[in-house]
């Protein structure tokens, strides 16, 4: 875990890690979103050559984050899996068996379509739309937050959009990087899975974005 940045929200400390996770210090929660496990297997099943190592590398990063932070609970803000069951789901179960001591909760996303019995057997608690912990709420798509009545001080964590920003370099070149995106009312986590697309943000003046560049997390100054 070479790099992290502390971001404070409502007097709570959140550690943004280059591993594309957030660790909530006060509650010992590890938060991540959009792993899209099984996506590489889904593409290979369709005849598209995608290296099997991609999913293994994502799982190694996942396990490394758990070993480093030693969370009391892991909260996945949607899209743990990409599609119906395939061989990569079986591989996940093997890793999960080694991490049975860590409670896991999934706020279901639009890609989480495997049967509920599967999650039960994997020891993963599931929530359909919104999960609350104190004054912080967790939802896959921030648009679903409109259904929850906000009280003063409430703050949302979400995923779904795979946020990114474009950074210009020399020679009028630009590169796109995944980022943590914070507004006054909600945050959007970068996709944890590396075999995912990104959505280019246009942050407002009051927003904050923290860019993930290899082994670093950097505050993006517009």
Model-based region annotation:
Residues 1-77, 82-222:
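Extended recognition/assembly regions associated with phosphoester-bond processing machinery
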